[in-house]
Each structure stands twice: as structure tokens, then as C-alpha cells.
Amino acid sequence: MKGIVLLSGGLDSAVCLAFGVRSLEVALCLTADYGQLAAGREIAAAAALSAHYGIRHQVVELPFLREIDCSALTGRLGLPEPEEMELDDPVRSAETARQVWVPNRNGLLVNVAACYAEALGCERIIAGFNREEAQHFPDNSPQFLDAVNHSLAYSTLSGIRVISYTQQLDKAEIVALGQRLGLPWSLVWSCYRGGDEACGVCESCRRLERAKRSAGGVRV
């Protein structure tokens, strides 16, 4: 069986790539550039991870998303910087989720990947969803996966399906899985910003740092 990985270069998608190369034939890694602040770092991380596993890498340009988007991820708003104690606060988490929400991003990316998958004869699209963020990002949820697969049954002739090896895991469990898979941590970029070093204070950095400690002090 052949598959395509939606690869941002971050924790979840990197672990899905590491798992995917052991589970099926990965034909392509796709990275989206929609004008996000971390686009350059994400593309570089995804390219390095793809090269590490010997997989072809391609960048898909989606400039219109930045033109219509008012998300903090594209710089239209200031990035939220929640304290670690706020990560499990449902009100604060819902607020930060709204700030970084990109309209229909995962729905769009899955369908772009489906075009490539069908053209390349791939049966699976691998995406890095997770249980922790599904609480406030519906496009990480099992319901989203079921719905998009129902749609793909009609929009593709070959019955392509989206799978995620991390969807039932929280961030600490994903870090632990990455450790078991021998993920090259130095190649991963999870920060919402695109500086020389991870900022350490955006929500993505906070969640990764907490996950590392929960997984036993993993050095990522």
C-alpha cells in the first residue's frame, strides 16, 4: 500500500512520517505554504525529514489563504502566549484556538493531498492529528476524519482514505512514540514563529515542552 504524508515538520506529522515509513510505501511528503509565520522553518524541517527518510518532498503554495485569513499564524493578529498552567483551561484554550484558526485549513490540505494521492496511485493520506488539540480544533477530531473519508469516497475514484497514527494520543504520548521510532529530533520544528530558535512561549512550544517533561525529560 502507498501513501502520502502531510508534513509540516512539526511533532505530530514528523512522528506520523516515522511511523508511516514502517507501515507502508510513502511516495511523497507534502508541505503547505499559506503565508504562515513559520513557513520557511516548516519547509526546511519537512525537507530535512523527507531527506532523512529518503522520501520525495514537495511544497504546495496556497497564497490565497493568507489573503483571506485573519489568523495569528499568518501575522494578522498577535500570537497568543498562554502560560503552561493555562493549556488545560477550557476557556483560555478555546480563546487561543480561535486566534490561530485558519479557515478550513485541514479540510483544504486533505483535499489537495487527495489530488496528489490519486494521481500517484496512493491509497492513503497520513495526517498528524492528535487527541490533545482535538478538544478545541474540530479538524483534529475523529469525527472530522470520518467525515472527510466519507467525502473522499465520492470525490476520488480510488477510495483514498486519510489515516493518522497519532490521533488517539496526547502530546506526551506522541513524544514517547517518536522516541521509540528513533525520530531525528533535531530536524523537527514545532514553533509557530519562524526565528533562528524556537520562541518557547507560543502555545505549540509550551505544549511540546510539557510533553517532553511528561515523557521523561526527552531532549527534543
Curated annotation (Swiss-Prot):
InterPro entries: QueC, Rossmann-like_a/b/a_fold. Signal peptide: none annotated. SUPFAM superfamilies: Adenine nucleotide alpha hydrolases-like (SSF52402). CDD domains: QueC-like (cd01995). Pathway: Purine metabolism; 7-cyano-7-deazaguanine biosynthesis. Keywords: ATP-binding, Ligase, Metal-binding, Nucleotide-binding, Queuosine biosynthesis, Zinc. Its EC number is 6.3.4.20. Binds 1 zinc ion per subunit. It catalyses: 7-carboxy-7-deazaguanine + NH4(+) + ATP = 7-cyano-7-deazaguanine + ADP + phosphate + H2O + H(+). Pfam families: QueC. GO terms for biological process: queuosine biosynthetic process. One of its GO terms (molecular function) is ATP binding. ATP binds at L7, S8, G9, G10, L11, D12, S13, A14, V15, C16, L17. Its cofactor is Zn(2+). Catalyzes the ATP-dependent conversion of 7-carboxy-7-deazaguanine (CDG) to 7-cyano-7-deazaguanine (preQ(0)). HAMAP family: QueC. This is 7-cyano-7-deazaguanine synthase. The lineage of its organism: Bacteria, Bacillati, Bacillota, Clostridia, Thermoanaerobacterales.
